[in-house]
Amino acid sequence: ALPMLYVPRHFFINNHVAVEEALGAETYAEILYHAGYKSAWYWCEKEAECHGLEGVDVFEHYMTRLSQRGWGHFIVEAIDLDAGTCRVRLEHSAFAYQLGKTGHKEEYMFTGWFAGAMDQILAARGSDLRTISEQTQSAAEDGCEVGVFKVKPLTGAAR
């Protein structure tokens, strides 16, 4: 198991919002995507080794642990390692609970996590396929009750 830090939700969210206000949401999202990608890769690599997991089991384990840590409830709706695709539903988002209906996709911090996890699993299988992730909806948006994240293969210039 990896060392953990535990902080109150309001403490983390308040710090997150302060950095977003200072940098701008777009810049902050880009920074968090890359940092989250790297962290997810590392976490999945270490946990797979520790627990003898591989493939989809690594991704499912990651979603379970994220859910247990209080970020929200992450549900893998679909995953296809051969295609490099995945769809994750987020219920009970810590961001949506703390911030309410803002009209924005507030959970962008999580986006790089899904591609990082998927790519580590693919690399462990010997695949050169790499992915990108995007948030398509948030419980913080009007008319939405859950967040949705989609992972798809990198193509063309994006590689």
Regions found by a protein language model. Give the residues of each.
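N-terminal accessory segment detector
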Residues: 1-109, 126-131, 137-159
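Active-site helix/loop of acyl-thioester processing domains in fatty-acid/polyketide metabolism
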Residues: 108-125
